[in-house]
Amino acid sequence: MKIKEVIEEGKNVLSKNNIEDNVIITRELLAFVLGVKKQYLVIHFADELNAEDYIKFKENINKLINGKPLQYITNNQEFMGLNFFVNENVLIPQPDTEIIVEETLKKCKELLLKNGKIKILDLCTGSGAIAVSLENFLGDKSEVFASDISTKALEVAKNNNEKNNTNVRFIESNLFENIQEQKFNIIVSNPPYIRSNVINNL
């Protein structure tokens, strides 16, 4: 089966299961299975897909139909122009959370007029998306700390810190429990506020 035919099949299956953006999702999924960029699919649309890759593609289509988010299948989510590793140990960074980063950066700009360096805490960091993004934009103008109660979430956040070549410092803590001695110019937080019984429907 040709790549273009596989994309058409995937799109139709997702459409029948009321999954929106089915063309985009199908292409992202196939690119993930093949380990290529989406542009490759356009250039090689007439190429034959081997049986092994087709089986993997079908398996992942079934995961989508059964409610597994694309980001947990590909282990990737773009946020603030950066790529973040995500798995079931963290919530998927949402586009509207970028507003928090943007507003924090505005506040940082004001504070930097008065301070040579600012200290920021991202409380309940999860994937580390907010902390890593802030450190990426501010660089050596800031010291960014990130905390979470979950060891597994911190492992993901540390992975993203390394992946994006940032220098966030991590603290395992239940809210302020292990960071009471620290003082910060800015504390930012976007804790999990979604009811656990609806997470799989996001």
Predicted features, each with a name:
Residues 99-201:
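Conserved SAM/SAH cofactor-binding pocket of Class I
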Residues 32-107:
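Conserved AdoMet
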Residues 5, 21-24, 52-56, 95, ...:
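Generic recognition of short, well-ordered alpha-helical interface segments
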Residues 18-22, 37-38, 69, 112, ...:
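Secondary-structure boundary/capping signal
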Residues 7, 11, 58-61, 101, ...:
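A generic alpha-helix structural signal
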Residues 14, 34, 41, 49, ...:
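Generic leucine side-chain signal with a strong bias for well-ordered alpha-helical environments
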Residues 1-57:
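A short N-terminal interaction module
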